[in-house]
Structures are given as structure tokens and as C-alpha cells.
């Protein structure tokens, strides 16, 4: 069986309802309805893929697999900016708001570069609180789940130092990556429990919090002196004052500086996302407006059942929107044929159920429309992830018709910590979601 067949050779759990797509309001061809004259083949144009996706960073397969498990498909702005530079081994200063993915920058790039040697620490990460240290260690564990040879340890005050010493004495348990607070790490170095002569990468997270305080800065300096002169140094923070920047640079050699706009918003996979509040009977009118007004390379429209997929696909084609439907209600052979037709860009509109919402890589999809809201946040993640894969820009629009839809929308915003606003009445500038 081919890889394509593997991707779509299973039945989606669909609602066996008798619901069909909402009928067109009338057939007089007015703007806003699924009517003749809306030839989408004249809309938009194919856009090359030039922006960065995680796979384009040439990360180890084990890292890409872990990233996929986490549901991440597109790097945030700070990740697109910093990861390539970090992988080149250069020193980095990065300022970006909390929640924009700074931690993943140094976690992924250090895991990419680490070469584990028993009894040696090659990556040292420092932060100002034990809570943050524990959180960073957990991120390392999450992204190194397919790298069993990599050991990560966390060290902070408030615990018996002898336990840390025992861990570090044993080559079998000695971490290759150490995360900790300056006070405890300096004590371990001072008492010769921790040797840092093999450190290749030195990271300060929330560096301003450590370098602002005289005592903590002194600990950082002592630890820094215990590491080799030739190493990579990376510093990250949500806030960097003009007074702190020169202090940071004293630890570095010709660092590249990355300052992500304060107004940058974290969005799910870097996609723009909106919802449209409307009644069930208004869905076709709004869908027609979107297909007419929005520029796109390819669009995927998600519905909740095979019957609705079939009916909506039929309605679209009757109204001169050439589309195909992919769902479990057609034979495996036919499903593969349709999938290939869409993948090869012979059709630009696809109506699908959740069978097409998982693991399908089609570079040109940059618009996803939830004609029917998904059942939960996980399904939403898989659906809208179809738009803007491979690091391209993308847009996702969800139709919200009832209280259940609103509950799902709220759950999505809470789960992914992403506000999803209402679709603007005056539309969206195509340059914000079409790759240039």
C-alpha cells in the first residue's frame, strides 16, 4: 500500500445523520449565493513555497516526529527568525513576548546539536526560578522523547544538594543537558560536583531577571568562567532594557539580535483564524461570498457527515465552483483518485469530512473553512492545520450557528490560548494570508 493510501485508508467517525447542506436561498444568481458565474478557476494563482516550516530547518527525524506529536506544524515568528541562526552556532540575543515560542528555539536547536558523551554536560541552561527550570526540563523531555540516549537534569535550590552530587558522580546518570538556577549550579561547580569543561552551548532564559540582580549576576559570571571560552551563547527574554543589553553582550561574540514586535500575536500554527456567526440557512450564502471574495491557492471545506459532503459538493459544482468530495462514503480506489486529483492541483476546492483532517500534506492549501464546526479542539487542530502547511501563510474560517458551536470555539481558544475574532465585515487583505 502506498503512503497516500496509508493516509486515507480508514473510516472517519462521522455522524450518520440525514442532514444535507443548507439549500440555496434561490437560484437567481445574485451575489452572495451559490450561483453560476462564480468560477473559482479564475481566482488567485499558485504561489511558491518560500517561507519556513519545521521540516525546512533540517532537524533530526526524531525531533520532527516529536514536534508532530505536539501538533505543531508551523514555526512562530520568533522560531522562524532564530532557529536558523541558532543552528549555525552563532551567539543570539532574542526578545519576544511570553508565549511566542522562545523556549522551543533553544530546546530544539540544542537537541539538534548535542552529541551525548557519558559523564559530560554539553548544554547548560539557566533561568531565575525553580518553576521555570522545571518547565524547561519538561520541554526537553517532550521534544527528546525519541532520543533515548539524551539525558536531561534539573537542579535548583530548596532540595538536598547531596542528591544532586550523587546524580552527577555517576556517569550513567550524569545529564548531557543541565537546566538550573544560578545559585544551585554555582554551588555545584564550587564544590566540584559539576564540571563544565565540555559545555558547548550556554543559554540564559529570562536573562534580564538574572543579570539585573547583582547576586544572581555574580553567580552567572562564576558559572560562565567555568565553561570553555569557545562556545555558543544564547540569551532570551520577554523584556530587555537598554541598560541590560550591553551586559548581555559582554558574554557574547558578535551576537545576532532578534526583536520580535511587541504586537505580534501567537496564533495556532501561524494561521489567521476567524469565525462567522450565522444561521444554518445562511451558510451557503456566506460560503459563496468567501469563495468569491478571498484569494486562495486551494481550499478545503469541512463538513460533519458524508451526506453533507456529497450534497455540498454537488451544489458547488452546479453553481460553477468545480470541487471534489473526499470522505469514507466513496470506495477506497475512488477516494485515492480524488485525493491525487486535488493534490496535483487539478481541482482547487475540496469538500471533506474529518477523514481528510489528519496527516494530509498538500502544499497549496492555504484556506480552510469549517462549514460545520468540529466536535472538539483536537479535531479543529487537525482540520485547520491543512491550511498553510510547509510554513506557508494560511487562513481558517469557522461557521458558528448554535450554542454547541460556541462552546467548541471557546474550548479551542482556551486549549490553544489563541483568541479567534469574528470575521471582519470589510474582509481581509489578501497579502496577510497569501505568501509573497
Swiss-Prot record:
It is found in: Nucleus. Its EC number is 3.6.4.13. Keywords: ATP-binding, Helicase, Hydrolase, mRNA processing, mRNA splicing, mRNA transport, Nucleotide-binding, Nucleus, RNA-binding, Spliceosome, Transport. Residues 270-431 form the Helicase C-terminal domain. A motif (Q motif) lies at residues 52-80. Transmembrane segments: none annotated. ATP-binding RNA helicase involved in transcription elongation and required for the export of mRNA out of the nucleus. SUB2 also plays a role in pre-mRNA splicing and spliceosome assembly. May be involved in rDNA and telomeric silencing, and maintenance of genome integrity. This is ATP-dependent RNA helicase SUB2.
